[in-house]
Amino acid sequence: MSQERLLSVLRAPHISEKATNNAEKSNTVVLKVALDANKAEIAAAVAQLFEVKVDSVRTVVVKGKTKRRGNKMGRRSDWKKAYVTLAEGQNLDFVDSAE
């Protein structure tokens, strides 16, 4: 995989209560990823960029909500979320690295 594609696959960490619980209980990190990224690309990107061993990847496409502002109707964009399970002994903590 090219370095350019590697950097474009991962968008941002997804921080939520569910994501925090998954990180503590099952060593799973939740990431926002490119809509056209597949599981193999996501696993390779996480392994190479963060130097960790990936155990499995699960993905879900989150549909954008319909929003209304006054009389105008609009729709937010769809986005893809990836649950990346790391191997035993591996750790990837976004909160501690930001401090």
From Swiss-Prot:
This protein's record includes keyword Calcium: no
Gene3D superfamilies linked: 3.30.70.330
CC terms in the record's Gene Ontology section: ribonucleoprotein complex; ribosome
GO molecular function, one term: rRNA binding
One annotated GO biological process: translation
Keywords: Ribonucleoprotein, Ribosomal protein, RNA-binding, rRNA-binding
Classification via Pfam families: Ribosomal_L23 (PF00276)
Classification via HAMAP family: Ribosomal_uL23_B
PANTHER family, per the entry: 60S RIBOSOMAL PROTEIN L23A
Subunit record text: Part of the 50S ribosomal subunit. Contacts protein L29, and trigger factor when it is bound to the ribosome.
Protein's UniProt name: Large ribosomal subunit protein uL23
Taxonomic lineage: Bacteria, Pseudomonadati, Pseudomonadota, Gammaproteobacteria, Pasteurellales
